[in-house]
From Swiss-Prot:
Gene3D superfamilies, per database record: 4.10.410.60
Name of this chain's protein: Large ribosomal subunit protein bL35
InterPro entries assigned to the protein according to its UniProt record, in alphabetical order: Ribosomal_bL35 (IPR001706), Ribosomal_bL35-like (IPR021137), Ribosomal_bL35_CS (IPR018265), Ribosomal_bL35_sf (IPR037229)
Gene from which this protein is expressed: rpmI
SUPFAM superfamilies tied to this protein: L35p-like
GO biological process, alphabetically ordered: translation
Gene Ontology CC annotations of this record: cytosolic large ribosomal subunit
Coiled-coil residues: none
Record family assignment: Belongs to the bacterial ribosomal protein bL35 family.
Length: 65
């Protein structure tokens, strides 16, 4: 049986946690930052978790994670 290919874009975006979830970076922190409040940018800084609704898609993209 052939190996399953990992989606390389997903491998760069998600990291698996010990509990089986996936960490991800928040959106809206790349450009046009001057009009965004400091508090908003600060809250976007820490990693978020992939929601349970999207978990199946991420797992399918990362078969060996």
């Amino acid at each position: 049986m052939p190996k399953i290919k990992t989606v390389r874009g997903a491998a760069k975006r998600f990291k698996k946690t010990g509990a089986g979830g996936f960490k991800r970076k928040h959106a809206n922190l790349r450009h046009i930052l001057t009009k965004k409040a400091t508090k908003r940018k600060r809250h976007l800084r820490p990693k978020g978790m992939v929601s349970k609704n999207d978990l199946g898609l991420v797992v399918a993209c990362l078969p060996y994670a």
